[in-house]
Amino acid sequence: AMGKPMGTYVTLEAPALIEPDEDYHREVSEELAKQLRNLIPDIEKEQSILVVGLGNRDVTADALGPEVVDNLFINRHVIKEYGKAAYGCEKMHMISSIVPGVMAMTGMETAEIVKGVVEQTKPDALVVVDALAARSTKRLNRTIQVSDAGIHPGSGVGNHRNAINKESLGIPVIAIGVPTVVDAATIVGDAIESMIQESGEEGYFFNREHPKALSELNNMYVTSKDIDETVKRLSFTLSLIHISEPTRPY
């Protein structure tokens, strides 16, 4: 009914996510870790997990995926060389990562690159991080969406690419996304919506296709003025999920 693939979809509403409150962001990281552990099969067992940072690091609003990967604790190479004893642990997930870039840079579909890496490194699960397009200005930089249904890179801004999901890769794919841009038509629609809320037609624009006059704005995407700081802050929040520690209480 929603036009989405079947799966589990979780939205973490975090209104203060745009604020530089370290304690708040730590709580969000811990809750996100809980949700990941619920979605990744057999997470209590040691696994090899590949984290994919989707997006273009040269476009600030689209750099969330690459920024998260930059901040991750990567250990696959060390464990394969020296074993878990290098970290003083008896039990530990192996974490690897890749930033496949965008087709304009590589000439390849993101799904092709990821599939090649999966075939060579054989991870048990895939975690994909991407910036999303918001359906409401109230969600901009304020929600974290998690799903086990995979992801279609670029679909939020109309660039439809091959899907990255369990069907195409053969392993569980968990997608994490934060809306960092919103199209101009949505901004106008939200503004009009707020003006007619008392008229008894609340939800008029949200529940319908945009009128023709607004549809001309659909190719224009807007982000917040402090998006560089916001993306950097969000990247730390998403990277502190402690996914490498299977014995962690959450």
Identify the meaning behind each predicted range.
Residues 1-46:
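Extended, charged alpha/beta regions that create polyanion-binding interfaces
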Residues 191-224:
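Long, charge-rich alpha-helical interaction segments
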Residues 70-76, 143-169, 197-206:
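Gly/Ser/Thr-rich active-site loops/lids in small-molecule metabolic enzymes
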Residues 241-250:
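Single conserved hydrophobic/aromatic residue that forms the stacking wall/gate
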Residues 11-15, 48-58, 97-101:
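Short glycine-rich or small-residue beta-strand-to-loop segments that form or flank ligand, phosphate
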Residues 111-162:
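Glycine-rich phosphate-binding loop
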Residues 56-93, 97:
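Glycine-rich phosphate/diphosphate-binding loop of Rossmann-like nucleotide-binding domains
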Residues 86-117:
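A structural-propensity feature for long, helix-poor, extended segments
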